[in-house]
Amino acid sequence: MCSIGEDDFGDTGGLHAMTAGGPVQIATGGTGECQKCGQHSDDLFKVNFRSEECRDCFLNYARHKFRAALGAAKALPRDSDVLLLLDGSIESIVLLDMLHYAQTQNTFKRLHCQAKVLYLDESVVQEQQSLDIDRLQKLQDRYTPFDLFVIELGTDLSNLRPLKNYTPKTSREESDLKIKLDKLRTLSARQDYLQQQRKRFLASVAHQLNCTHVFVPSISKDLATQFLTSIALGRGGSAALDVALCDDRLDHDIKLLRPLKDLNEQEVQLYVRARNLEDLKLGPSLATYGQEKGETASLQNLTAAFVRNLQENYAATVSTVFRTGNKIAPNRHVDQDMCQQCQSPLDSLLSDTLLAIEYSRVVSLEGSKLSNHNNDLEQLSMQRLNKDDRLCHACRNVQDEYL
């Protein structure tokens, strides 16, 4: 079975890379002999911890990571119906290019699945100009015969349209999703709530299009950030699924797959150069939601800044962080109920830590009134913990942020 060696990522304990250095450099290319195939090349590609190689050898290496991620875990059954998320990021275009290449190979090497592409118009949340249909049409023309669908985030599924039948709205009413976001007091709560709603919306669209799997373009840097963010937000019990290849918590038994999880930022940029891909800047992406408010505006922004600093100075550490998440088993029990918001296992009955957190919160809010009544403090703590037993700890915190 196809697999990926740890040496591909420079993770031999991380010891060889644990010295501070400058920002990751993207080589501009040069001429010489490919160290992989021995052929002369006018445009060499240099990935950290690998020898210089020609364009074809580099593309084989990058595409191997994509295929190996899916093949090693047998995560994608043969002839599955797949929905690929195109979110406007360059990573999503790389994922589209890799999937198209895998679909157009001969029978032996072909990735046997039926793929559709979804562009999720997120401008309704970002309050920015809607997408450029002409640019999206160029993308569909390049990646024929994939069917491309478009829908605005948070709208009714009846608005799902093939690209040829889609017309951007010149004026729009404020969506229910935007109204709910505006009622949340903190940016951390808004970003967390938006991420959960986006996953549920993707599952609904996939179900509407009769797809059983969803491809998302998360790379190692994104997953390292997500892993640390999940822990900081109180989602430690489900953090492993937030960074795993396969997340099976979605509605309608839809499985969310991250086939680019083993690619880093440098490899993505080199792949863009090798394939002459263009960042079409299709529209705003949720990856940038709230970033304009600064690094300290939310836990998510602060964590992303921390991981970027690691990427610049300790390149191999980012891979180590998200691989740590892969080694953590999800906290699941057969008879355990699931959170109605994020579909993670409910954790309120499994940990005394949550009771201690609520106790501290009650002391802060009611301590001056109940200083001589410890039993009352404990009772209030239990009431807060059980006031909505359908939500996990993190989603309950989001609910507490509503104005």
Curated annotation (Swiss-Prot):
Q: Under the GO molecular function aspect, what terms does this record hold?
A: nucleotidyltransferase activity; sulfurtransferase activity; tRNA binding
Question: Which Gene3D superfamilies does its entry note?
Answer: HUPs (3.40.50.620)
**What Pfam families has UniProt attached to this entry?**
CTU2
Q: Principal place where this protein is found?
A: cytoplasm
Where is the protein situated, by its record's location annotation? Cytoplasm
To which pathway does this protein belong?
Answer: tRNA modification; 5-methoxycarbonylmethyl-2-thiouridine-tRNA biosynthesis
Q: Enumerate the UniProt keywords alphabetically.
A: Cytoplasm, tRNA processing
Domain of life, per the record? Eukaryota
Q: Name one GO cellular component term.
A: cytosol
Q: Does the keyword Cytoplasm apply?
A: yes
GO BP of this protein: protein urmylation; tRNA thio-modification; tRNA wobble position uridine thiolation; tRNA wobble uridine modification
Q: Which InterPro entries match?
A: CTU2, Rossmann-like_a/b/a_fold
What PANTHER family does this protein map onto?
CYTOPLASMIC TRNA 2-THIOLATION PROTEIN 2
Entry similarity comment? Belongs to the CTU2/NCS2 family.
Q: What function does this protein fulfil? A: Plays a central role in 2-thiolation of mcm(5)S(2)U at tRNA wobble positions of tRNA(Lys), tRNA(Glu) and tRNA(Gln). May act by forming a heterodimer with NCS6/CTU1 that ligates sulfur from thiocarboxylated URM1 onto the uridine of tRNAs at wobble position.
Q: What is this protein called?
A: Cytoplasmic tRNA 2-thiolation protein 2
Q: Highest lineage ranks of the organism?
A: Eukaryota, Metazoa, Ecdysozoa, Arthropoda, Hexapoda
